[in-house]
């Protein structure tokens, strides 16, 4: 475990795969092949689809819709790997079909649309907004700003302003609670989703948002790191899908256990450590969650209570789970870091109708473990 300052300070990113002995050429080949399958592959493998001359969308293959989560994930993947045309297609589609201009959610994005662009919901999901904003800022810094809607930096700053000031005029609700600075599950509720907490993004929003908003984002980064300590079980490392503001599981609708959303927490903690190295708790948490899964086979992954008690129900996205557990190796110092990465490397992309979520997490993990999930700063 190399304990230098985070990549934000050094500009240097760990290539964990190379550290563990994988051939650099094979790593780059795997990255290129994974992009090709997901964005250019056969109909039964890809999750990105071109539409018309200048649009494109990410398909949730299990639900046959386009989600703000997936659109923003696709944009982040595209900016990290330098695919500007794909990025612009996704963003144009998002602005055209998902962006809401009226009503209590004006300024946000509908979380679910049909592939033809018709809306399935008029509600937003804040994990989409935060990924849109981060991807847009990176695009602004990597490629420069164009004409609207490709004026990436302004689009990002306007969105971030909406996310924290919405409702101040009495219409709608902010996505972050103004008092405790914690991201909400949806704007009109007062509880959270631990997997939405991205302090490493908020640190960057604190640099690049509109000046009057920067202090809020700095405080949000601190609040989210504290929150994750509360939401992750002190022995197993597991966190619930929904949690109250004190971190305790919110099981009112059955989402108080470790299941699909929860998997992202390990990945987020790993990337926060790689970028900023703010809190050594991240290393302890990564060790805990990898230790919990060390003796479990992916085909037998389950839904778990956060104390580790297994339910009968099998995991819906086992490839996603083993991927995020591997991404935690950015922070992990324990004996399971290498084994988690080896399991990931030896697992192929998922096929079939449930592949969308698993393979998004797979590509993010591949980016992160190869040193290619980077902070793009202004020139």
Predicted regions and their residues:
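Aromatic-rich carbohydrate-recognition surfaces in CAZymes
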Residues: 64-71, 118-144
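Alpha-helical repeat scaffolds
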Residues: 214-222, 338-345, 378-379
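Solenoid-like repeat scaffolds
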Residues: 343-353
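Short glycine/serine- and small hydrophobic-enriched flexible loop segments
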Residues: 75-82, 131-142, 200-207, 267-274, ...
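Solenoid-repeat scaffolds in large eukaryotic assemblies
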Residues: 74, 86-87, 149, 156, ...
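Extended ligand-binding clefts on enzyme/binding-domain cores
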Residues: 2-33, 37-40, 45-46, 64-68, ...
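Inward-facing hydrophobic residues that define packing positions of alpha-helical scaffold repeats
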Residues: 78, 91, 136, 153, ...
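Internal amphipathic alpha-helical repeat/solenoid segments
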Residues: 27-73, 78-121
């Amino acid at each position: 475990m190399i304990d230098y300052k985070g990549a934000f300070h050094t500009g240097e990113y760990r290539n964990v795969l190379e550290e563990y002995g994988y051939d650099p050429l094979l790593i780059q080949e795997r990255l290129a092949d994974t992009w090709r399958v997901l964005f250019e592959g056969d109909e039964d493998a890809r999750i990105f689809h071109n539409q018309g001359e200048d649009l494109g969308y990410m398909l949730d293959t299990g639900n046959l819709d386009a989600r703000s989560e997936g659109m923003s994930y696709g944009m982040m993947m595209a900016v990290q790997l330098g695919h500007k045309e794909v990025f612009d297609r996704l963003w144009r589609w998002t602005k055209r079909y998902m962006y809401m201009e009226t009503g209590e959610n004006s300024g946000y994005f509908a979380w679910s649309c049909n592939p033809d662009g018709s809306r399935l919901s008029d509600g937003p999901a804040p994990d989409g907004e935060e990924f849109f904003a981060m991807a847009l800022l990176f695009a602004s810094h990597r490629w420069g700003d164009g004409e609207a809607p490709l004026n990436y930096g302004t689009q990002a700053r306007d969105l971030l302003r909406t996310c924290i000031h919405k409702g101040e005029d009495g219409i709608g609700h902010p996505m972050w609670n103004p008092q405790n600075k914690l991201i909400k599950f949806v704007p009109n509720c007062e509880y959270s989703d631990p997997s939405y907490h991205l302090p490493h993004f908020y640190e960057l929003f604190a640099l690049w948002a509109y000046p009057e908003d920067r202090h809020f984002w700095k405080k949000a980064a601190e609040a989210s790191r504290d929150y994750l300590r509360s939401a992750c079980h002190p022995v197993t490392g597991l966190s619930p899908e929904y949690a109250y503001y004190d971190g305790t599981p919110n099981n009112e609708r059955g989402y108080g256990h470790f299941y699909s959303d929860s998997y992202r927490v390990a990945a987020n903690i790993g990337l926060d450590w790689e970028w900023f190295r703010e809190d050594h708790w991240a290393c302890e948490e990564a060790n805990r969650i990898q230790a919990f899964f060390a003796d479990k086979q992916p085909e037998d992954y389950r839904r778990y209570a956060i104390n580790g008690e297994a339910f009968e129900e099998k995991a819906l996205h086992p490839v996603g789970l083993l991927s995020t557990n591997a991404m935690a190796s950015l922070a992990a110092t324990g004996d399971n870091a290498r084994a988690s990465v080896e399991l990931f490397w030896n697992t192929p992309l998922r096929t079939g109708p449930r592949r969308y979520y698993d393979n998004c997490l797979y590509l993010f993990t591949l980016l992160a473990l190869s040193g290619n999930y980077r902070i793009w700063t202004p020139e």
